[in-house]
């Protein structure tokens, strides 16, 4: 065996990235699900975001494993920055993400890598999922959206929020991640969705329509909402408006960004009127041609101009009216 072929045989096919901050009771099964993969050519990069001593002690025991590397970080609370720190250490041809409270099924990596290598035009992949509870049992939760699989060109589906891609479901070419710049560390929340949008601008996506990941629901599970959620979507759509070259899709992005701007300004107006005014002004340059935009601006402007006391009274009146009507 030549030196170059020996080096190639030692090179991992997949770099698995797990960011973690405490949650030791869920971290253990997450790591065990990586160790149980039927595909053996992987490396595991665990980026620790300043966890407590108990979690750090457990991670220290893993450093003796030949394919595991722990990256010790000061706490930032920024998932994108933590994942990027691990991404800079990755050496695999592909990168797979796993959250510290979720798990993989044993065949996940093997099936995804085989499918990606058989279809060179698709440089990233995702899978179906099941919901699990704190104990790892499969559960069905009220309000869960039905699984609607999409493959191929999915940018418009992503923009319209018609496709659900969980972070632990994704495997992506490392070169493609480098091409789009990794995670945006300035995203308030939903930095994964922002990355999917940028990946979809450069490549079609493959799908393994099987539930190969378990997404855990528990009390510590974070769900962004309100202003942070809208601010994140606004930032992503603004980037998409600059990146998308197809004229029809660009109009779609423009309309979505205009509506998101109005929604964000309206919500900001409840507590931060100056921020709401700045948000409205930021949307004018891209949205001034849309008739619906000006109707929305008028509505939000009236809301901002109304004294807070009257506005609160108006809102209470609307709620009371609705309750009487029903």
Model-derived segments and spans:
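C-terminal subregions of glycosyltransferases and related glycan-biosynthesis enzymes
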Residues: 2-9, 217-326
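Cell-envelope/extracellular polymer assembly enzymes that use nucleotide-activated donors
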Residues: 12-15, 33, 43, 194
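A conserved hydrophobic helix/loop-capping motif in glycosyltransferases and polysaccharide synthases
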Residues: 14-26, 30, 37-38, 47
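Conserved nucleotide-sugar donor-binding catalytic segment
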Residues: 16, 88, 127, 146-236
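A conserved acidic beta->alpha catalytic loop
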Residues: 33, 40, 48-58, 75-76, ...
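Glycine-rich, basic loop-to-helix element that forms the pyrophosphate-binding segment
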Residues: 73-90, 111
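Short aromatic/hydrophobic "clamp" motif used to bind/position activated sugar donors
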Residues: 95
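Conserved donor NDP-sugar-binding/catalytic core segment of glycosyltransferases
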Residues: 107-140
């Amino acid at each position: 065996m030549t030196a170059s072929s020996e080096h190639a045989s030692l090179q991992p096919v997949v770099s698995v990235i797990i960011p973690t901050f405490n949650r030791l009771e869920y971290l253990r099964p997450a790591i065990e699900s990586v160790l149980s993969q039927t595909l053996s050519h992987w490396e595991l990069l665990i980026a620790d975001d300043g966890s407590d001593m108990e979690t750090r002690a457990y991670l220290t025991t893993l450093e003796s494993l030949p394919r595991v590397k722990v990256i010790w970080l000061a706490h930032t609370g920024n998932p994108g920055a933590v994942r990027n720190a691990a991404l800079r250490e990755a050496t695999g041809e592909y990168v797979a993400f796993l959250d510290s409270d979720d798990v993989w099924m044993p065949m996940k990596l093997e099936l995804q890598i085989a499918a990606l290598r058989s279809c060179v035009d698709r440089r990233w992949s995702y899978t179906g999922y099941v919901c699990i509870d704190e104990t790892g049992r499969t559960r069905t939760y009220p309000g869960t959206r039905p699984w609607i699989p999409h493959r191929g060109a999915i940018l418009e589906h992503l923009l319209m929020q018609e496709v659900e891609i969980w972070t632990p479901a994704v495997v992506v070419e490392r070169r493609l991640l480098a091409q789009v710049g990794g995670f945006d560390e300035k995203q308030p929340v939903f930095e994964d969705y922002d990355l999917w949008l940028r990946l979809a601008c450069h490549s079609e996506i493959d799908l393994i329509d099987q539930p190969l990941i378990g997404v855990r629901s528990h009390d510590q599970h974070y769900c962004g909402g309100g202003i942070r959620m809208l601010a994140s979507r606004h930032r992503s759509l603004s980037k998409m408006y600059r990146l998308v070259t197809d004229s029809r899709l660009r109009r779609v992005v423009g309309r979505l960004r205009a509506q998101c701007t109005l929604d964000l300004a309206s919500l900001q107006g409840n507590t931060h009127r100056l921020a709401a005014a700045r948000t409205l002004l930021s949307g004018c340059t891209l949205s001034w041609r849309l008739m619906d935009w000006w109707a929305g601006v008028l509505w939000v402007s009236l809301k901002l101009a109304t004294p807070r006391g009257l506005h609160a009274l108006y809102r209470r009146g609307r709620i009371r009216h609705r309750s009487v009507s029903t």
